[in-house]
Amino acid sequence: MAKLTKKQKALASKVVAQKLYPLQEALTLAKETAIAKFDESIDVAVNLGVDARKSDQVVRGSVVLPAGTGKSVRVAVFAQGEKAEAAKAAGAEVVGFDDLAAEVKAGNLNFDVVIATPDAMKVVGQLGQILGPRGLMPNPKVGTVTMDVVTAVKNAKAGQVQYRTDKAGIIHATIGRASFSVESLESNLKALIDALAKAKPASSKGQYLKKIAVSATMGPGVRVDQSTVVA
């Protein structure tokens, strides 16, 4: 394990391990521990009471963060005809079908989100080995396989984030940047937690939201008192 620098040790000392902080105080600490020269992400880790080994307990979906992500998103859409024109009008940077598939196969992936109409999945399905490992494969569960390409493009541009439990049943997501106000980060985190609550699997028993922690990219984790998050 790499040794902490003096500056990192000083930052870590600001945060009391295992202490539960009220949400606004936790976010303030996360912002204060972001000292890199770039605008660090503010991330959240949510431990869920699910058995991620069971397919019916995998929590997956998407949510539009009200204050956005602070990131400019390039969108690619696989569609034809009217849907292709609608996607372009909605602001998609890259729109195509077989021609776009050829670009992807050639290694030209100059986009952050991929959306597809259902009929395009016969083409997109052949790109799984390229798109899948990069987290770009369209999926109806997160709203990226849809006939409503206009809404999908607008959501992606507006700050939609996708989430999925990892093998340990933890959701990792970015809720903004260190330059965001505490209020903006708070509204984004609450929107994510609300979405996760609605996505609770019917087979999940016991406590569902087990632990919430926020952190800057290079900063220590700050545990959040859940009573200050969930109404």
Swiss-Prot record:
Keywords: Repressor, Ribonucleoprotein, Ribosomal protein, RNA-binding, rRNA-binding, Translation regulation, tRNA-binding
Classification via CDD domains: Ribosomal_L1
SUPFAM superfamilies: Ribosomal protein L1
Statement: the UniProt record of this protein carries the keyword Acetylation: no
GO molecular function, one term: tRNA binding
GO cellular component: cytosolic large ribosomal subunit
GO biological process, one term: regulation of translation
One Pfam family of this chain: Ribosomal_L1
Subunit structure: Part of the 50S ribosomal subunit.
UniProt-listed NCBIfam families: rplA_bact
Family: Belongs to the universal ribosomal protein uL1 family.
Protein purpose: Binds directly to 23S rRNA. The L1 stalk is quite mobile in the ribosome, and is involved in E site tRNA release.
Name listed for the protein in its UniProt record: Large ribosomal subunit protein uL1
